[in-house]
Amino acid sequence: MVYNEKNGGGIPPVPLSLNTATPWQNVNLHNDQQTEPQLKSHPDTDPRITPYLGLRARLSQLWFNRWTILLILVLIRVIILTANLKENLGDAKAKALSACTKVEDVGSAMASMPYYMSKGVNVMAAGSMQKAVEAMASVLKMILTGVQAIIMFVINMYIGTFACLVAAFIHGGLHVATAVVEGATKVMNDAISSITKGITDDMKSFQSAIDKARDFINSGIGLISKDIQLPTINIDSHIRDLQGIKINANGVVNGLDVLDQKIPTFDEAKNLTESALAIPFNLVKGKIDTAFSEFTIEPTIFPTAEKQALSFCSNNSFLNDFFESLITLVYKAKIAFLVVIIILALLAIFVMGYIEYRGFKRERERAARMDANAFNSQDAIYIASRRWTADGGMRLAKWWTKDTDSKNYLLIRWAFAYATSLPALFVLSLAVAGMLSCLFQWVLLRQIEKKAPELAAQVGDFAGDVVGTLKQVSNNWANSSNAVVANMESDINSDLFGWVREATESVNNTLTVLDDQIDHALVAVFNGTVLLDTARDVVGCLIGRKIDAVQDGLTWVHDHAKVTLPRFDDDIFSAGAAQSMGSDGDLSSFLAKPGAVTTDEINEAVGKVIRSLRNGVIQEALITLGLFLTYVIVVLIGVMGALIGWATPGKTRGEGGQQFGGRPPSFHNHNGFDPALAPSNAMVGNPASPHYQNEKFGGGGGMHDVASPAYEEVVYAGRVPVGNTRELITRYPSHQRTSSYPTVESPDPMPHGDEKVPGYFTPI
């Protein structure tokens, strides 16, 4: 911009080569009253003394940076948690020990139940066995009587049948023989008499004829000669002898009568058999009456189980060890968390120290970026105060859109700034701290949950100890009682059934004697006759085989005449407890409280601690989730605002929506402000100015080959109304230094932004 003497006054500006003062010390030569105060020069002090914090001062505050403070808060929460958890574990330990003592008492009482039950069982067993033995003796006597009667019935049946048949056969035969002999004798005697009489008569007739013939002859001869003497036939003596022949059947008949009288009726055999059979049976019955008349089984013969005193809590340090291990686990977890958090806090200190160091070195470098990217003075303050979030927003905006002068670029930076504001980051940091706290608590919870099954297993072992003791007591009592039963069984088998065996042997011997007696009777009757073998066959068929069958049956009775008394089961007192243990794997047994099917007091003590810790973790996790969702809502609000601004069309320049102006000049290098970079007089509002082009496109000084005169004013972010925009550009004084050029007056009042504010930048 050229100097206008008409408008600028009679005094030209001081050339830059002759101006030794900095632009910060220029004064308005056209204003005699000096309405604007002059900037004070820097104090002449030690350069190490500054009103702002240097690197050493910043590093001295690293120990309470935000992340370290958050980690310390998490550490305090963990310490409080472990302290409460230790107290809860102490209470759980006391409750578990109390519950274990109760379980021990219940287990001892239950393990002693066989002591009380065995007395009643002994009385019941003794009474039952005595009644059983008495009933067995009575039944045995009745069986013996019945067997005796059956044997006698069978013997009498077969002997009587045989006797009747034999007697009828023999007597009938003898009677027939007697009648035949007597009839034959009579017939022969009558025939002999008749024959002798006929012979006698015939001989008489013949003798008479002979006598007549003699007489005749003699009469004839006597005439002639002497009489003829004929022999006389005299057979009277022979006739008399023949008549004297008498067939006497009395001897034969008498013999048959004698044989008939000698045939036995087997009454003797029957009576002998009855007498012989009655002897062993009566002997056994007498012994049974004698032995069991005063037979008693006293309950005292059975043993009594001993009382049991279980001590799986008193003499078992598992519960103590278990809870001590949990407390030790909590302590170790606290130490581990302390170490981890302290290490993280130290790392945060070192990281923040490195960040501060880098930030301090780059702070001056950011001045150029601030000059190049700041939208207005407020944006410059934001970039300076929130350098990391501002830098992140600029990087995101540049990644999204390459046009840094576009509205979208500004909206993206605005959304990122909205999401990374101090309240939003505070909420996010609380959520992160809550997540860390929940993570530490969850790790501790998982460790305790892993240890809990050991307690459940040990409680199961407690129940197993009770059941094992019950089994041992039951087994010992059953063995002792079964020994008593075995002795009683041996006595019964040796006495009572020994008598039965003796009786069966006697009966067998008696039947053998009976068989021999029958054979003797047959021999006595039929010896020397053809009927002996026939009689033996008949007797063997009718009686002998039946007697053999009876003897076989008695032999079987003899071999199996013994009793086996029932024994007591080994688990007579422990079967119920074992079944209750096997019905539910979660100890729904006699050790559980009434109404508690799957838990018991011991597990409940630890379960309460676990549930309390889990509920605390869930509650804090929900709070953390709420904080995180709050931050997400903030982020969404920022994104929605950016999207709405993105979708809303901008106002035109005539509507006061478009901004126009140059960027602020940059008088800084990597060491800070450099007066050599500031030209004496420059008009940024002049597009032809090389410095203006450099500031707009270069992002910081460096192209100052052409020094424009009077670079003392800056035009920035003015609102330009409709009209001659070149003449309506608002000019702002730079560092209390007014230009020698007059202020451009606008014919119309400016909509806004027409105030003249000291400094480089004025917010829109």
UniProtKB/Swiss-Prot annotation:
Its main location: membrane. It is found in: Cell membrane. PANTHER family: PLASMA MEMBRANE FUSION PROTEIN PRM1. Belongs to the PRM1 family. One of its GO terms (biological process) is plasma membrane fusion involved in cytogamy. Residues 653-701, 735-754 are annotated as: Disordered. The keyword Membrane applies. One of its GO terms (cellular component) is plasma membrane. Keywords: Cell membrane, Conjugation, Glycoprotein, Membrane, Transmembrane, Transmembrane helix. Residues 1-61, 171-334, 446-624 are extracellular. Residues 83-149, 356-424, 646-764 are cytoplasmic. The chain crosses the membrane at residues 62-82, 150-170, 335-355, 425-445, 625-645. This is Plasma membrane fusion protein prm-1. It is a multi-pass membrane protein. The keyword Transmembrane helix applies. It comes from the Eukaryota. Involved in cell fusion during mating by stabilizing the plasma membrane fusion event. It comes from Neurospora crassa (strain ATCC 24698 / 74-OR23-1A / CBS 708.71 / DSM 1257 / FGSC 987). The lineage of its organism: Eukaryota, Fungi, Dikarya, Ascomycota, Pezizomycotina. Glycans are attached at N271, N315, N479, N508, N527.
